[in-house]
Amino acid sequence: MWIGLVGSEMCIRDRLESLNIFKKPKTSKLSYELDDLSKKYLATSARKNIQKAVDFADKAHDGQFRKSGEPFLIHPINVGIILAGLKMDGDTIVAGLLHDVVEDCEISLKEVKKLFGKNVSNLVNGVTKLLQLDEKLIDQGQAEYFQKMALATAEDVRVVIIKWADRLHNLKTIEHLPRDKQIKKSKETLELYAPLAHQIGMHKMA
């Protein structure tokens, strides 16, 4: 009887592990990497706010997974790492960590503002608007118009930088998408985002 119970428990755990329930170590490692980068140039208060954003994003995206099967949290932390690598300010990194919480989770801008301040909520809102613009203007003939509208829509250039960091990490994991979506995303990046990155001086990332 005990053997049967133990066997059943192991089967259940194996099933849960296949669903990524227990796969937290990689996100923890990425969090340490983000902190190592940020502590080189940011004050302790900013780093604490970044960790607060990591914890908030972890709860907001709980149960969400990437196409790769990895916890969704891996994506916003990688966006944060890219931004920290560019030595962006703390609010920009926090907004990068939270850039999907309003669009993909039941989180309001009001809540983001209450917890992280108006500056961060404005950046998150800007990224959300840019995403909506992206979806409307993906045709080849509208690339130049997209660049103009993106800069006009994003009152703060940091919005564009966050969106580019988001796109950059998505490209690094593009192999997990169906072939047609890989082609679509690559085309969008080359025609819409790469020229935009050059316009704002992000040559190394473009």
Where do the model's predicted regions map?
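Active-site helical microenvironments for divalent-metal-assisted chemistry
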Residues: 13-206
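Single conserved hydrophobic/aromatic residue that forms the stacking wall/gate
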Residues: 1-12
